[in-house]
Every structure is written in C-alpha cells, then in structure tokens.
C-alpha cells in the first residue's frame, strides 16, 4: 500500500512539474510578445499595416544610429563610443538599452537588420564586454545604487528573454550571476557587498515602487532559468505593497501614496509600482502563479477611489508628482500615460468585480484628454490594443467622478464639480514635505506645498508647457 501511495505521489509531482514548466514557458512567450511588438497569438493576433510600418521605421532609424556608435571590433574596453566608462552604472545601463533596441530590430521581420549575422555577432560581443568589464561579480557599485540593483538587472532580464535564441549561453550565465550578486533578494536593497560604495550603501527593506522592481528582477530570472521557486519567491514578495501603512512609504487607507518617507507620490513613484504590479498581474494571469493575495485588493480600491480623482483631463495632477514636475520633457499628460497603460493591463487580470470599474476609469481618462488621442502615442502594441478595445466597447461607460476627495495622509484634496470645473489643493504638514528637490531637479519648488491650488477647465493642454518655464 505504501508503495502505491509513493508511486501516486510521484506521478502527481511529475504532472505538477510538467504543468508548471508549460506555464513558465507560456509566461515567457507572453512577455516576449509584449516586449517585441511581434504577434505570438497570445495578446497580439495581428497588427495593422500602419502599426507594422511605424514600428519598422522606428527600429530602422534606431538600429542605424546604434550601429554607428558601436565599437566592438575596435576595442574590448567598452561597447559604445558614447558610453566608455564600464565602471559607471549609467554607462552600462545605457549600453544595455541600446543593445536591447538592436535585438528588437534583429528579431523584427522586414527591418534592415532582420536576422543579420554580423549584427547578431555584434550583440554577443557587446554583451560579453559588459559581462567581463562592467556588470561583473565582485565589482563595486559606483554612483546611483538604482542603476546597479534595479535598472541594469531589469533590462538584462528583458534582453535575455527576447534574445534567448541568439545570445550565447555562457554570456547569459555570466550576466545572470552578476544580477544575483548585485540584487540577490527581492525584499531588500543594499544587500550586496557591492553596495558599500554606492549612493545608498546600507541594507534596507525595499518598499513601494522599488519593491515592485526588485520583485520583477527576481521574477524575470525565475522565468529565464525556469525556476518555479524563484518565481514564487518574487510573487510572495509583492503582496506587502498592497498592505496599508500608517507611516512612511506605501498606500494608506484614504488612498494616499507616499514615497521617500514624506512625499506625496501617487504620480511618478505610484506609476512605477502600478507598472510593476500590472506586469505581474498580466503575465501570471490564468496560471497557478497568479497573484491571489488579499492585500492586492487594497490596490484595486486605491485605483477606483483614489486615482479616479487624481486623473484629471487625461493627466495626473502635478501635486502628486514630486520633483518630476520640473522635467522639460514631460507634462501632466505625459506622466499620466504610463499610469493609464498600467491600469489597462491590470484590468485584464483583475476579477470581474474590479475589472469593469478600472476599465471605466481608463476610458474616462482617454476621452477626457482633448489634446490628443492617447492610444495613438503608445508604442507598445499589446497595451495599445487593450486601450482601443476599451474605448470602442460600448458596454464600458466612462466613470462618473464628482464630489470632493480628501487625501489626508498626503495633505492633498481634489474637488470635481458638475459643471466641469475641477480643483486640487497641495498642502504640507509635519508628516508631508512642502516640496522635493533631488538630483538638481525642482530646485525652485519652494511654495508648491503651501496651499497651492490647481484650477482646471476642460482644456487638457492648460499645463502642458507650464512647469519647466518657471
């Protein structure tokens, strides 16, 4: 009898392992389709001729510029003439971003470099240089910790998922080992001995948007290595971001979001968190790895009862964008796009109780924007398809948002009237900073938390070129 039980348990274990292996492969293909904008018959069945040509034209231009900068046949010290310092996290990350774009062009049919043998060779040489001279086990973090522990390993995951068939296994192995070295645990930052020389040398619990990023690093490695335990480890580390906090970073019961301990940040850093969560929900949906932790429901509530007020005229109110308001390459409309994109992805994985309301928020944000039709400017075709589906679905009605919402924990208030007038008030207290400046950004934001009042008409372009001119 014992032998029969052991045999049955073994069979169940094998079947479970085989099923998980198929699910991991499915998640990888889904991610690959998302990254490449090439239909794999998952979320993208086909793409229009216009979108295809637009994607090819963009990749042709980018790949030409990138190849002109590459110096892999002239030196083994760096990859690009513009990023020669292989001890700089910034130069390594920029090099990887360019290689990532080159891989996209190489793998996209009808581009000028599609399946070009020399380009494939240059990609591998470039990654080998980085694996030996830049992102290496035993190296020290010089400069911004984020580049070494989040930016680089996240980009590496995407590169290795997209380029699994063209990147040499020895190079992949070295880069993954370096990723584990610099960011070993999804729950912590500053854990590597390399962090001692960075801008944030101390071990600390990874919170908010940073926790989503560190979890995605672990999740991506689990997908690449087909390691179910690593995938579960990443997913289990995500649940904490949905737990309401009473002080410091995170979401609050009144749907506020704080980052950097005392800055109202539902916008920029909230977007990072939502983006990471959206990827998890989208990629793990309909698998045994799906996120089912009850605390994630809190984030759905924050979206429906919080972001519905902060998304005004298709933009995100600037009182919750911290220092990013001073950047001359963005606006409230631009900063809202990744939030709306994330909500669209989240809606596809949310249960029916929340899905319809989130779709209604997305539809309202798109239709309220009379400056541009926002889906047309979305480069990711998976997301663009979802956005267009939501807009065209007559059963989805834009959410009717009216009344006053007080975000007491981040000292913000928003009021939306029946006549289309909206206003928001930005305050500060002993809990909340009056403004944030860092990295030479927002150095004149002195009074933006002193009761500053934002008054909106229905014109979405009112504040498009406002901040950076001050």
Give the location of each predicted region:
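Aromatic-lined, polymer-binding surfaces characteristic
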Residues: 67-336
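Extended polysaccharide-engagement surfaces of secreted carbohydrate-active enzymes
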Residues: 280-295, 299-470
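Positively charged n-region of N-terminal signal peptides that target proteins for export
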Residues: 1-4
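Sec-dependent N-terminal signal peptides
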Residues: 6-10
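Generic structural signal of hydrophobic/aromatic residues within well-ordered alpha-helices
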Residues: 27, 31-35, 52-55, 59-66, ...
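Bacterial Sec-dependent signal peptides at the C-terminal "C-region" and cleavage site
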Residues: 12-22
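Non-membrane alpha-helical secondary structure
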Residues: 20-23, 27, 51, 55-58, ...
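Low-complexity, Ser/Thr/Pro/Gly-enriched N-terminal "stalk/linker" regions
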Residues: 20-93
């Amino acid at each position: 009898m014992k032998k029969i039980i052991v045999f049955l348990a073994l069979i169940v274990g094998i079947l479970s392992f085989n099923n998980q292996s198929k699910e991991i492969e499915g998640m990888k293909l889904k991610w690959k389709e998302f990254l490449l904008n090439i239909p794999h018959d998952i979320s993208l069945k086909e793409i229009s001729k216009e979108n295809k040509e637009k994607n090819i034209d963009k990749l042709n231009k980018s790949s030409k510029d990138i190849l002109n900068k590459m110096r892999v046949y002239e030196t083994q010290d760096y990859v690009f003439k513009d990023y020669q310092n292989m001890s700089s996290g910034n130069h390594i990350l920029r090099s990887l971003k360019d290689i990532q774009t080159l891989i996209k062009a190489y793998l996209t049919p009808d581009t000028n470099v599609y399946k070009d043998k020399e380009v494939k060779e240059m990609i591998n040489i470039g990654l080998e240089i980085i694996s030996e001279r830049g992102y290496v086990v035993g190296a020290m973090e010089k400069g911004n910790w984020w580049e070494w522990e989040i930016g680089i390993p996240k980009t590496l995951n995407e590169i290795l998922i997209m380029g699994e068939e063209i990147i040499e296994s020895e190079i992949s192995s070295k880069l993954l080992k370096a990723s584990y070295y610099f960011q070993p645990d999804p729950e912590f930052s500053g854990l590597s001995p390399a962090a001692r020389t960075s801008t944030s040398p101390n071990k600390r619990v990874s919170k908010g948007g940073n926790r989503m990023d560190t979890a995605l690093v672990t999740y991506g490695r689990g997908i690449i290595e087909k390691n179910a335990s690593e995938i579960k480890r990443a997913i289990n580390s995500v649940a904490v971001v949905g737990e309401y906090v009473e002080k410091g970073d995170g979401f609050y019961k009144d749907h506020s979001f704080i980052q950097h301990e005392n800055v109202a940040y539902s916008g920029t850093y909230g977007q990072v968190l939502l983006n990471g969560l959206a990827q998890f929900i989208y990629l793990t949906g309909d698998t045994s790895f799906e996120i089912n932790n009850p605390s994630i429901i809190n984030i759905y509530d924050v979206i429906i009862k919080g972001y519905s007020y902060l998304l005004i005229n298709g933009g995100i109110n600037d009182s919750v964008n911290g220092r990013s308001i001073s950047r001359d390459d963005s606006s409230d409309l631009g900063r809202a796009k990744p939030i709306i994109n994330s909500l669209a992805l989240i809606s596809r994985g949310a249960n029916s109780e929340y899905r319809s309301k989130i779709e209604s928020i997305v539809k309202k944000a798109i239709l309220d924007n009379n400056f541009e039709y926002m889906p047309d400017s979305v480069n990711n075709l998976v997301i663009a398809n979802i956005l267009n589906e939501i807009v065209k679905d007559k059963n989805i009605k834009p959410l009717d948002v009216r009344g006053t919402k007080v975000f007491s924990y981040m000292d913000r208030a928003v009021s939306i009237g029946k006549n289309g007038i909206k206003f928001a008030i930005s305050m500060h207290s002993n809990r909340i900073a009056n403004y944030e400046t860092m990295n030479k950004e927002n150095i004149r934001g002195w009074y933006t938390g002193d009761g500053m009042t934002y008054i909106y008409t229905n014109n979405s372009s009112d504040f498009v070129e406002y901040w950076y001119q001050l």
